[in-house]
Amino acid sequence: SGKVRMMEAYNYQMSLKDDFIGDLWKKIVKNKIENQVKVLEFGNQLSFIKLKNYTLELKPHDSTNIEGSSALLYWKMIFSNSLDYFTRNKDDIRNSSLNYGYAILRSIIANSLTCKGFILHQGIHHKNQQNQFNLADDIIEPFRPFVDLEVYNMFELEGIDEENLTKDIKKRLLSIVD
């Protein structure tokens, strides 16, 4: 029954050992970086080789913060065709589009995890006590580059020139999960 399955998922989640959690987070970060490499390869960015090498340096729990180092390089390169250096500024349409796309993914992941009986506030790496979606925020990481690629396509390749999220941009971002 559904209640038994939920209890099994809960018990499993609560019984995970630190070594397993560390290795799991390492795999999540590795998959995220590998997908970021694919985005940069798609955009013919030569720096994807350096980004790819970061996956070789990963340790359990990402104790050396390779995710942070790779993110600095990734964000520097992904929108390098722009006249200005891209920052995750709240007024930047690319950033608004990324956040919108991530919110779509997060809600789908959170719903799927909840339906399987997992406790969302019990994350693998994310541990914020005020965040009810720590686990979803962990699981989303390897999927973020799919949103990044769509935003890259819209604003860098197609040259969409909007200042605000339009209905068409929102539709495109929603289509990622189709």
Language-model features, listed with the residues they occupy:
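Active-site helix-to-loop segments that bind/position phosphate- or nucleotide-bearing substrates
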Residues: 5-178
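Catalytic nucleotidyl-transfer cores of nucleotide-processing enzymes
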Residues: 1
